[in-house]
Amino acid sequence: MSGPASAPFGHHPWLTRRPEWTALEDHRAQGIPHPRLRELFETDPERARRYRVRAGDLLIDYSKHLINDETLALLQELATATDVFGLRDAMFRGERVNTTENRAVLHTALRAPRDAVIEVDGENVVPAVHEVLDRMADFAGRVRSGEWTGHTGRRIRTVVNIGIGGSDLGPAMAYEALRAFTDRDLTVRFVSNVDGADLHEALRDLDPAETLFIVASKTFTTIETITNATSARSWLLAGLGAQGRTGEQGRTGDEAEDKAVAKHFVALSTNAEKVADFGIDTANMFEFWDWVGGRYSYDSAIGLSLMIAIGPDRFREMLDGFHVIDEHFRTAPPESNAPLLMGLLGIWYGNFHDAQSHAVLPYSHYLSRFTAYLQQLDMESNGKSVDRDGRPVEWQTGPVVWGTPGTNGQHAYYQLIHQGTKLIPADFIGFARPVADLSEDLKAQHDLLMANFFAQTQALAFGKTAEEVRAEGVPEEQVAPRTFRGNHPTTTILAPELTPSVLGQLVALYEHKVFVQGAVWNIDSFDQWGVELGKVLAKRVEPALSEGADVPGLDPSTAALVADYRELKLREVK
């Protein structure tokens, strides 16, 4: 039974005063200050075999890191001392590990099998999860088959997901990742930005009669989402006004509008009253729960657009992939626990090597939005400066996460990683086979893609010495610019193919990595008060922009900028 946080979440000794922390500082300063990866491999012929783990379909190679066996042992001791495993078990049990909001954190329940028992406040939540999944599957099947039609009786051809944050980044990332598995007769578009241009571009070539909107907002009060949804409703009604059913053409009034809206809008929310006020039939409202954080939610009802695109069976394959890594994280011993190892390696660089960022570099065009998704997952979770006890931390927490798909990045910012002055640990994600959808000619390009994949990690690790440059006959004045010191740490994640299951495994791997780091840093990885502050201030400032109203409490800089904005806005109108 879940309940208020107890022993694992009580007062913690100051992290940097722990003997396990100071042992790592000493190790960094004395034992392994500047390990050369060339030397580490030369002195340990088994290093490549020993420094790798398997989790589900994922092979994770961490041999190209600035570590030795002692480093790993010390990091494991830090994990034990900070009770990472106790926190992990408490999360899986449904305890309220989100301490600032007093909530359970159970995104793992979203992919639990039907016969699992996971309790929140004494109630098994798994049946409710599967009830929603079954309703989603029924609705998705009706849209995909053409049984569900729009107000005029025409088949739905485009689904527009309106959400923001976790209600957009997750499903948008997964839709791109699994595009090879989508129904090509259906298109899904995503609208998130309150900038009207986002909605305009999404709708400009669509037929309202063939468009279905999914409005994703837990409270149905998210300002960006409801603003866009209201504009989308106006667009729909205006478009259908000239093409309604026979006998209804040009009809106006709430009843006619409600009929149209009910056939073209569904909601992902828990606020039935607000959903009904909007005109959406609450029978087409799919709920989720307060123990699911937005950035962990695309495998809940938030993923309805994805389920419509790839079908319920593929969606369940993805959930099964999540569950594989959940179980791995929950049960694998520390020395072979992939999320634990990845999390601890990040701490090694962020806290003991002063690395400020972390690059995630997928060698797959389909993962073009994967790093953007991880930015929210990691930076919103661990971008904190106060610990669980309310004290300002005095150690680095979450890194800046960035990256784009290879090989594009090689012709942009890899230069800085190779020869710049910053230490940037990087994850390289690749696949042994291209997706089956490709023609044989295009499949043949996959080996070239992966040749770059392996070459980059080798070059980053081992570089190119001045002697090797001279051996090529390079003039002496050109030797220094063409020398690569190497020693840039990378993790290689290799899977057979990008499938729904493998995508679920990848996302769960990073979810639990983020959890591990938050546990060590003693921060709450599941709130996001920085996001909330911005929302409050935006509501205060908006009347000054739209109406010219005085807003008390604006600082002089912002007040002056608001006045400039108003002047420029009015000048253009004239």
Name each model feature, range by range.
Residues 157-163, 213-219, 357-364, 400-401, ...:
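Short glycine-rich or small-residue beta-strand-to-loop segments that form or flank ligand, phosphate
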Residues 49-50, 169-172, 199-200, 223-225, ...:
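Short helix/loop capping segments that flank catalytic or ligand/cofactor-binding pockets
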Residues 238-245, 254-438, 463, 486, ...:
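Active-site phosphate/pyrophosphate-binding segments
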Residues 174-179, 204-208, 229-232, 282-283, ...:
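Short, solvent-exposed amphipathic alpha-helical segments in soluble enzyme
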Residues 138-146, 152-332:
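Glycine-rich phosphate-binding loops that contact phosphosugars or nucleotide phosphates
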Residues 9-152, 444-473, 517, 553-557, ...:
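Extended, charge-enriched "interface" segments that sit outside catalytic cores
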Residues 20, 33, 47, 67-74, ...:
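General structural feature for long, well-ordered alpha-helical segments within catalytic domains
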Residues 484-488, 492-521, 526, 533, ...:
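C-terminal accessory domains/tails appended to large, multi-domain proteins
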